[in-house]
Design a protein with these regions (language model features):
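Post-signal peptide N-terminal segment of mature Sec-exported envelope proteins
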Residues: 27-43
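Active-site phosphate/ATP/adenylate-binding loop shared across adenylate-forming ligases
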Residues: 12
């Protein structure tokens, strides 16, 4: 009987450890996906405001392609989503000489819509 209890306890520990590891890995992928979406949104909004902006030579996106665990398909889906949706978060400055890119990208980054899209994309 003690043998069965010991085996059952070991199974519970293994399953718990496995679930925890999977959650950590998923969380890292989720954060990478959100980071890439933020990069893509900043680049998209800067191109909208000024096509000669220095941000257009920012190679941060390459980090996500080369060093993250995101697949190329996931990156492409995120980029397409950002290009289609991020301008919905565009805010207009009260000062006509300025813009609100940082605030607009922050709103997009923190949106439930982006979170939901990324969750759906990573689960496919």
């Amino acid at each position: 009987m003690k043998h069965i209890q010991m085996i059952a306890m070991m199974c519970v520990i293994c399953v718990t450890a496995s679930c925890t590891t999977q959650k950590v890995a998923y969380r890292e992928r989720f954060e990478d996906a959100k980071g890439y979406a933020l990069y893509a949104c900043i680049a998209h909004m800067n191109k909208f405001v000024d096509s000669t902006s220095f941000i257009n030579i920012d190679y941060s996106g390459e980090y996500f392609v080369q060093l993250s665990s995101l697949s190329l398909e996931e990156i492409i889906r995120i980029k397409e989503y950002v290009d289609k949706e991020c301008m919905n978060y565009w805010s207009i400055s009260q000062n006509p000489e300025g813009n609100m890119i940082a605030y607009s990208t922050w709103k997009f980054y923190n949106s439930k819509d982006l979170d939901n899209f990324i969750h759906k994309t990573l689960r496919k």
